[in-house]
Amino acid sequence: MINDKLPKIWHGGDYNPEQWDSQEIWDEDVRMFKLAGIDVATLNVFSWALNQPNEDTYNFEWLDDKINRLYENGIYTCLATSTAAHPAWMAKKYPDVLRVDFYGRKRKFGSRHNSCPNSPTYREYSEKIADKLAERYKDHPAVLIWHVSNEYGGYCYCDNCQDAFRVWLSDKYGTLEKLNKAWNTGFWGHTFYEWDEIVAPNMLSEEREDNVSDFQGISLDYRRFQSDSLLDCYKLEYNAIRKHTPNIPITTNLMGTYPMLDYFKWAKEMDVVSWDNYPAIDTPFSYTAMTHDLMRGLKSGQPFMLMEQTPSQQNWQPYNSLKRPGVMRLWSYQAIGRGADTILYFQLRRSVGACEKYHGAVIEHVGHEHTRVFNEVAQIGKEFNQLGDTLLDARVNARVAIVFDWENRWATELSSGPSVSLDYVNEVHKYYDALYKLNVQVDMVGVEEDLSQYDVVIAPVLYMVKEGYAAKVESFVENGGTFITTFFSGIVNETDIVTLGGYPGELRKVLGIWAEEIDALHPDETNEIVVNGSRGSLSGSYSCNLLFDLIHTEGAQAVAEYGSDFYQGMPVLTVNEFGKGKAWYVASSPDAEFLVDFLQTVCEEAGVEPLLSVPEGVETTERVKDGQTYLFVLNHNNKVESIDLKDSQYQELLSTQQLSGTVELEAKGVFILAKV
């Protein structure tokens, strides 16, 4: 478990008592926290200016008081380092802490996420305050976990970053000769002869808006560099804390599929993954499920923390709808069912001013417990106390994996062609969504993950094939695995240089095909996938769009063909028998109906069964602990649904009822079923 001081699902959230100067409010907060079953408060996230009013003065007395007061009332602390927004005095005295944006404009003090990651000043003072906090609270029994900074993100293009980029490149490539080759700088006369000739790629040099770059290799490396730079800032604080508190876990809150940081690399430096879940009004339930699975996958299935979710509404979406009754509870159990061991909110008391005053909270502006949201939070708190440690450390066992890679995403998005509408994350989600509808458990994995534990591995739009990965795929398939990849795969290496010899490059052998050309049409234009006869659930015709690989089989079998255009009759879906396994290639972006039928067929052939057969709009997921399975059934619909449990006998953990046969699950309802 994360910390055995609190052996249950943690329940709490961000608390900012420094925003009020009222003992009466602070006392009321504690009273209501206890009513709601709140047992963890995240403190000190944005308090740097309060903690350090000037260069030489530190003030932690206010924090002592709040940590002690909460602990005396049975509430533990998730202690943040306060470095997510630097103080105004620092920006005034040391302007090197201020970022330069993509357009070359130097920021002034304001907002947050505003510190240059390569500022010597920022690094010095952030490390110093983390050190002082850790030294002060190293023996405090209230501290469960350290929370470094907050939601790292954004890039900087200042001179400090540009200089550091050159050093980073020198460390990576060693010589300019190797760098020039890796970036293909013979194109457009870009050969570099001195390291200081290299400039940061932004609107003033190689890039334009919307990920348009003239030199993808340069832009790709700058993204790697900025991700590493922010990670270095995190590691400075991590190490400062670790020397004082070797046994208290350390984390920082990630943001799901956030594009700018390579979270698989970050997760290696985190004791536990934590993330903030803020779906938009139109976010599919399956997308949120996929993101939970991705966060779990960052550390190879280790349970994660849900660090933030709103109890009711957000404040920064275009349309900030209320969570309908039951939805917060439902989504909380969705997170737990997919690997979360904590449910924490932003925020515990609603701010009275600035941009988050309309962001939802456990305690609303009215200031009492007689609200719908508070009562729902209190219900969850009661249930978590009832569950105790039953679900802690339970794992999710999946036989199907989907590959997700941030560097591949960057390269795909930076690609100059063939279509501005190609969206890597959307293509990945389409495959996940089909498996979600089929109630098949999925792991989201990085390219370093061991594939041998899976029966089926899907790598949509694997544009960049990193060194050794093709051999890894070949070994997986040779030993009986089923591999699926798609159009626009196997095109380039890690520096965005095309692999010569025909697409899909290093994957050509295992797939048994050659892609001669790639057609790109407007997203509204479609072609047909016409199945040759039938195979499993696949039959008839389906729609496809976006990109269309014109492929020739080289040992693979054509399972389906294009139905129109000049490439009518050419293969669009192939399967290649390779060793003991199979490798599938989907040459276009298919509709949802095709993906459900296709992946159902693939899973049946691989012997992968669904968790349960349930109505549309009902989600299933399963965790396992000490040989005991816990099946979560989540009704996202606005009506009661009938769930057929067959002849199996279950104990439902929330109601403690014994269930079997056909049972009714209320709208927005949850079952946690332990097989008897």
UniProtKB/Swiss-Prot annotation:
Active site: E151, E308
Lineage: superkingdom: Bacteria
Cellular compartments per GO CC: beta-galactosidase complex
E.C. numbers: 3.2.1.23
Coiled-coil residues: none
One of the GO BP terms on file: galactose metabolic process
Binding residues annotated for substrate, in chain numbering: R112, N150, W316, E356, K357, Y358, H359
Residues that bind Zn(2+): C116, C156, C158, C161
Temperature dependence: Optimum temperature is 20 degrees Celsius. Lowering or raising the temperature from 20 degrees Celsius results in reduction of activity when ONPG is used as substrate. Rather stable at or below 25 degrees Celsius, but loses 58% of activity after 30 minutes at 40 degrees Celsius. Loses all activity in only 10 minutes at 45 degrees Celsius. Exhibits 27% of maximal activity even at 0 degrees Celsius, but enzyme activity decreases with a further increase in temperature until it is undetectable above 50 degrees Celsius.
Record keywords: Glycosidase, Hydrolase, Metal-binding, Zinc
Reactions the enzyme catalyzes: Hydrolysis of terminal non-reducing beta-D-galactose residues in beta-D-galactosides
Activity regulation behaviour: No activity lost during treatment with 100 mM EDTA after 2 hours, and the addition of 1 mM MgCl(2), 1 mM CaCl(2) or 1 mM MnCl(2) has no effect. However, the enzyme activity is inhibited by Zn(2+), Cu(2+), Ni(2+) and Co(2+) to different extents. Addition of Na(+) or K(+) slightly stimulates the enzyme activity at low concentrations and the optimal concentration is 250 mM. A further increase of their concentration of ions above the optimum value results in a decrease in enzyme activity. The enzyme is still active even in the presence of Na(+) or K(+) at a concentration up to 5 M.
Reported uses of this protein in biotechnology and industry: Could conceivably be developed to fulfill the practical requirements to enable its use for lactose removal in milk and dairy products at low temperature or a reporter enzyme for psychrophilic genetic systems.
pH curve summary: Optimum pH is 6.8. Exhibits above 80% of its maximal activity in the pH range 6.0-8.0 using ONPG as substrate at 20 degrees Celsius.
GO molecular function per UniProt: beta-galactosidase activity; metal ion binding
Functional note: Hydrolyzes lactose, o-nitrophenyl-beta-D-galactopyranoside (ONPG), p-nitrophenyl-beta-D-galactopyranoside (PNPG), 5-bromo-4-chloro-3-indolyl-beta-D-galactopyranoside (X-gal), o-nitrophenyl-beta-D-fucopyranoside, p-nitrophenyl-beta-D-mannoside, o-nitrophenyl-beta-D-glucoside, p-nitrophenyl-beta-D-xyloside, p-nitrophenyl-beta-D-cellobioside, p-nitrophenyl-beta-D-arabinoside, p-nitrophenyl-beta-D-lactoside, p-nitrophenyl-beta-D-galacturonide, p-nitrophenyl-beta-D-glucuronide and p-nitrophenyl-alpha-D-galactoside with highest level of activity with ONPG as substrate, intermediate level of activity with PNPG and lower levels of activity with all other chromogenic nitrophenyl analogs.
Subunit structure of this chain's protein: Homodimer.
Family: Belongs to the glycosyl hydrolase 42 family.
Protein name in the entry: Beta-galactosidase BgaP
